[in-house]
């Protein structure tokens, strides 16, 4: 702190002392002190602001304004716990103190407690429906929680209040991208760039959309344009690395990841991808080092643990891979991604009984007829309405690069307005899910049965395949239960008995894993109106088919939900 700052602080401390007599003088003194505290916070002197707040609170422990600013000072000095306590106390004394609710949401958001952050922002909005900050912050939280449709709506309300707020347009584009509405998201990014041509985030996010659309040349040129603006932009370097890896330009990908890490050393996802690319290059020791660093940074990441376990498999060490799985699952019971990898590790460790128990298709793979909603005359009418809705859906695009679909189209979220026939489909699906949950064995020893979510939310999308279309082996790592409903099938697929082209297959992991033993496979023949439900950690794929006609299906996830 320089001499002028010390002089200013000394004056502020003097101003914080009570002056004059009577309540009016005290109120004026507090108002004056609060203004000085706010100025200190805005100028980056949080420690000094906190010290003055403590003095004021000693005389005025119930003043919500002092409690609120004291909380901000505590948070800015790294004391989130005290900040929460002060804000909750402020709200107790003044329940309609909208700034305190919003600030409480900010602290919870920064600490990763997104559910409490959501609650705080919604309370702020209930008190003051036109409160811009709460709408915008709520959008950020909802987007982080994987609820992009709600996030888009929150951003829209924020922009209705403050239409010139550029980050709101950028984030709306991100939410639309997550919803699979790529053309709309590009419009938002382009609008941002019209206003601010050197906005590196808009260039980077636009490149990510081009990547999803498999317009790889445009993606690369857009990323490089972003890097011309800011050569050390870590997120752009990371995305460039992903693209270069996809194009099998592995050495260039390594360079991009290393530059991203140099710009942001604690970028855990970048360490994961660097390890994965090193593994592809056969540089196993360097790959292991990258994975271990990622685990240090993010010990709760199932993906990096699975990648490290796969490295052990490539070295012929299945027991080490299995031990890694068990240690992780001891801390994260029922984690979908790790259960999927454990099924590989068990097989490679020659644990036949363990593999069969984890992948028990007899107990956990369930097929049923969805049933026709009363609004429709019969199954044909219902499926025709669904097919028309899907094929006209604005989010239906050629398969995004990050998805499992090949030679087909993929929609975004279908459970958003206008839902059309999807509303009746969802109602029937929820009934089927409840029947499935109720029929599960009461087996606390099995990780799938043990991790039944008390509450859940649904997400659904469509896959439209034509000749040669298929899905490569994959899982749904964020979900507990997944499934598929068949809307329409090519006649030859519907009529097939021995030819399994177009069927769904369970058991085969993706090619990038280094298992040597053949997985046990289970096949299900699709038929229009059939609903298939299965644990989200079951690897599954669609067998390619060569036939005229469309294979239209609706896939869905049951996502554990712990919201308000």
Features from the language model and the residues they span:
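Amphipathic alpha-helical repeat scaffolds
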Residues: 34, 38-42, 54, 292, ...
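Conserved alpha-helical positions within TPR/SEL1-like repeat arrays
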Residues: 38, 65-76, 99-110, 133-144, ...
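Non-heme Fe(II)/2-oxoglutarate
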Residues: 355-449, 470
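TPR-adjacent "capping" and linker segments in tetratricopeptide-repeat scaffold/adaptor proteins
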Residues: 15-32
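Catalytic core of non-heme Fe(II) oxygenases with the double-stranded beta-helix
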Residues: 416-430, 434-533, 538-544, 549-564
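Structural marker of alpha-solenoid helical repeat scaffolds
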Residues: 59, 93, 127, 161, ...
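Structural signature of tandem alpha-helical TPR/SEL1-like repeats
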Residues: 42-51, 76-89, 109-123, 133, ...
